[in-house]
Structures are given as structure tokens and as C-alpha cells.
């Protein structure tokens, strides 16, 4: 039975949860706006869709899924993959409507597949493929891809096709770097009781400083126009994009295991049964499926929630649900959406960059479960460097590849993970000294 008793501490923790959910969500719509070449007036609709879907997904997990204080939001793997596919295919002349339609079909299929994994209990077997070595690579490459996105946001770089006339504005970038340093300083140097509010303080301070330094900056414009498939629809289907989306959905299950396993220490009385994973998969798949018409980034439990739980020391669902309720209110009231979305992208990107730097620590924790030698290091080195190479490869050089393979091979993160899964599970590394 859920306890709805309200206290000052739970409300404060709930507000902290809201800003955590908010900052992880608000950075996404502007990148989609840029990547899919939409007018600025569409940003309010995309942002409200994102807040609404994220709040409902958090409720679904809190009451019907894993039932823990773990944020369910736009998955970083999905986000990076969608931006990579869109940029790569658009640069080759593929119509935006074709990209959006194919992604919608692939995301819907992955949602159904995730639900089937939950209903059937196959997730436990698939989890065995994600060995510690694979998770080291996953954390390193996901961190590299996401921090690239956040640095782009800090610099104000476009997320779509490169604009030759674009120039970096140094004063806004300098302010975003100052916000990043403020959050880092709070986390590193202040006592734990103050450091846990670094994200909150950094966001509000950066917000105020931005409008003090750049008072002419425009606010969120446009009216709310509810519509299905705002990124585009009715285009031709691309088997390669659909296949890449389905594979992304399969790889995305690693986030569920990482988040639930990582929070076991906070909920020792709940045990480690398979039922919790099955419910979480069903909730993730269901929310991914029903929100396809809203064109939001598909969901996954956030492993970074572990850091927030550690910082605040509050593991209760109550505070998490309070934060989700505030997020829902922001989604339903356009005036609140406009207010909170006036937080500039460089500021929110700087705060989120700091929150994702600990992915390196997660990678190092997984690496401690492996004994690397001069002979078995190739299980990590080859997938890692192949993935990094493909991440840096300009999309134009893949122009002549078959349409079925092109979206997958242009995604260094996915290729690196798949190569690591194959090498780690097909080669008997335990026999190699």
C-alpha cells in the first residue's frame, strides 16, 4: 500500500526529483526540432508531449512496473540512435517524412517486442549476453555519444545537417561552462547534504544568470497544436531504419537490468526475483508503443537515478511520485511549460553533462569484474575502437552501402555494442590467459 503522507523533506526531495526528470527531458525536444528541420513554433508541442509522456511513464513504473524510485524517461541509447540516423540519412537526401515514418514503425515494433520479452520472461536469458565486458563498452560509448550531444547544446551547434554559416557564440558558451564548473564544484567540494542539490542549484543559477547576461534572448514561442506524428508521417518505409530501431530496442533492455540491479542495495527487503524485471519490461514496452503517435523518444529506466538516490538518501516512491506529479502539471498547463522551458538549452546541457560524467565510473566498476590481459583485451579494444571510428565517420562515405545496412553501420554505438556481444559470447575468453 502506498503512503501518501506529505512532509517537508518528501516535498523537497520531490522537487529535486522534478528537476532531475525535467532536465533529462527538456534537452530532447530542441534536438529533435533541429534534426527534423521543424519550425520553431513546433517546440512547445514537442516539449509538452515529452513532459506528458515522461510523467505517465514514471507513474506506470512506480505503480505497475518495477515499483521503485527510478526515472523512466527518454532513453539515451534511443536518443543518440535517432539523432544519428536522422543526420546520416538526411545528409544523403532521404526525405524527412521517410525517416520519421520508418522510425515510428521500428519504435512500435520494438515496443511490442519489449512487452513480449516481459510477458515471456525471456529477458533473464537475454541479460546473460550483456556480460561485464559488454557493459564496460556500453557505458563508455553511451557516455561518449551523450556528452557529444550535451557539448553541442552548450555550443549551440545545430543537430541536423551542418550549417556552413553557423558561428559559435563564445559568451553563451562561457556561461554554460561556468554553470558546469559550479555544479562540479558543489559535488566535489561541498558536504553531502549540500552537494546533493548541485543539479537544482546549477539549473536555477544558470537560468537567472542567462537572463541577466542575455536579456534579449527569446522565450519559447508558438501555440500548442496537438497533432499526431509531429515529426512527419506518410513517408516511404526504409527496412534499414526499421531494423536499426528494432535492434536498438533489444539493446535497450540492458538499461532495465542496470537500473534495477543498481538499486537492489536500496531495497533489500524486496529480493531479486524475475517478476520485477518482467513488469518493468511490460511497462516500458507499453508506454513506448502508445506514445509513438506523439513522436517522443522511447523510454527506458535511467541508470543515472542511482546517483540521485545516493545523493539525496531518499529511496521512497513517495518523493519520486511527487516529482512526477509536478512534471505532469507542467505538461498540462501551457503557461508552466513556457516558464520552465525558458531555461536555455546551453544551461540545461551543461547540467546534464555533469550528471552523465559518472558513466565512466560505472564502466570502471564493471571492469573490476574482469581480469584483462594482453591477450584478452581484444574483447573490449576491437569493438570500442570500431565503434569510435564509425561514430566519427562522416555519413557521406556510407552513401553507396545497401539501404538495409546503411542506418545500422552509420551508428557506431550500436555496431560497437553488437560486436562486443558477439565477441564476448562466441569466444571462450575464460580459457585464454
UniProtKB/Swiss-Prot annotation:
Cytoplasmic side: 39-42, 90-102, 152-169, 218-230, 310-319, 367-379, 429-433
Superkingdom field: Bacteria
One Pfam family cited in the UniProt record for this chain: Xan_ur_permease
Molecular function in Gene Ontology: xanthine transmembrane transporter activity
Any one annotated GO CC term: plasma membrane
UniProt topology in membrane: Multi-pass membrane protein
Induction record: By glyoxylate.
Location of the protein in the cell: Cell inner membrane
Family label: Belongs to the nucleobase:cation symporter-2 (NCS2) (TC 2.A.40) family.
NCBIfam families linked to this entry: NCS2_1, PRK11412.1
Protein name (database record): Putative purine permease YbbY
Species of origin: Escherichia coli (strain K12)
Gene name in the database record: ybbY
Amino acid at each position: 500500500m502506498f503512503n501518501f503522507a506529505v512532509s517537508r523533506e518528501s516535498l523537497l526531495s520531490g522537487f529535486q526529483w522534478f528537476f532531475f526528470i525535467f532536465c533529462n527531458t527538456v534537452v530532447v525536444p530542441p534536438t529533435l526540432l533541429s534534426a527534423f528541420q521543424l519550425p520553431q513554433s513546433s517546440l512547445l508541442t514537442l516539449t509538452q508531449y515529452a513532459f506528458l509522456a515522461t510523467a505517465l511513464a514514471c507513474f506506470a513504473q512506480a505503480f505497475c512496473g518495477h515499483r521503485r524510485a527510478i526515472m523512466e524517461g527518454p532513453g539515451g541509447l534511443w536518443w543518440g540512435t535517432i539523432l544519428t540516423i536522422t543526420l546520416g540519412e538526411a545528409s544523403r537526401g532521404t526525405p524527412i517524412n521517410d525517416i520519421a515514418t520508418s522510425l515510428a514503425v521500428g519504435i512500435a515494433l520494438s515496443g511490442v517486442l519489449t512487452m513480449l520479452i516481459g510477458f515471456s520472461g525471456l529477458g533473464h536469458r537475454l541479460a546473460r549476453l550483456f556480460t561485464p565486458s559488454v557493459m564496460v563498452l556500453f557505458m563508455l560509448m553511451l557516455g561518449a555519444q551523450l556528452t557529444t550531444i550535451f557539448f553541442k547544446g552548450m555550443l549551440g551547434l545545430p543537430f541536423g545537417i551542418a550549417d556552413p554559416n553557423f558561428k559559435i557564440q563564445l559568451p553563451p558558451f562561457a556561461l554554460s561552462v561556468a554553470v558546469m564548473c559550479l555544479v562540479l564544484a558543489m559535488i566535489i567540494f561541498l558536504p553531502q547534504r549540500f552537494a546533493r542539490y548541485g543539479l537544482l542549484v546549477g539549473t536555477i543559477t544558470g537560468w537567472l544568470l542567462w537572463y541577466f547576461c542575455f536579456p534579449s534572448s527569446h522565450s519559447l514561442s508558438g501555440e500548442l497544436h496537438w497533432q499526431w506524428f509531429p515529426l512527419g508521417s506518410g513517408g516511404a518505409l526504409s527496412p534499414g531504419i526499421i531494423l536499426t530501431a528494432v535492434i536498438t530496442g533489444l539493446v535497450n533492455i540492458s538499461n532495465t537490468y542496470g537500473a534495477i540491479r543498481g538499486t537492489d542495495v536500496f531495497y533489500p527487503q524486496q529480493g531479486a526475483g524475475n517478476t520485477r524485471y518482467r513488469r518493468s519490461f511490460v511497462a516500458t514496452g507499453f508506454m513506448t508503443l502508445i506514445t509513438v503517435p506523439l513522436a517522443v523518444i522511447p523510454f527506458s529506466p535511467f541508470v543515472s537515478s542511482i546517483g540521485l538516490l545516493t545523493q539525496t538518501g531518499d529511496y521512497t516512491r513517495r518523493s519520486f511520485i511527487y516529482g512526477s506529479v509536478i512534471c505532469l502539471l507542467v505538461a498540462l498547463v501551457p503557461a508552466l511549460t513556457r516558464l520552465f522551458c525558458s531555461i536555455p538549452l546551453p544551461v540545461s546541457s551543461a547540467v546534464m553533462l555533469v550528471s552523465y560524467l559518472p558513466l565512466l565510473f560505472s564502466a570502471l566498476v564493471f571492469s573490476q569484474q574482469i581480469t584483462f590481459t594482453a591477450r584478452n583485451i581484444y574483447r573490449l579494444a576491437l569493438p570500442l575502437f570500431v565503434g569510435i571510428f564509425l561514430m566519427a565517420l562522416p555519413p557521406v562515405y556510407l552513401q553507396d552501402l545497401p539501404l538495409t545496412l546503411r542506418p545500422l553501420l552509420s551508428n557506431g554505438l550500436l555496431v560497437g555494442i553488437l560486436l562486443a556481444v558477439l565477441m564476448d559470447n562466441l569466444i571462450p575468453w575464460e580459457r585464454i590467459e
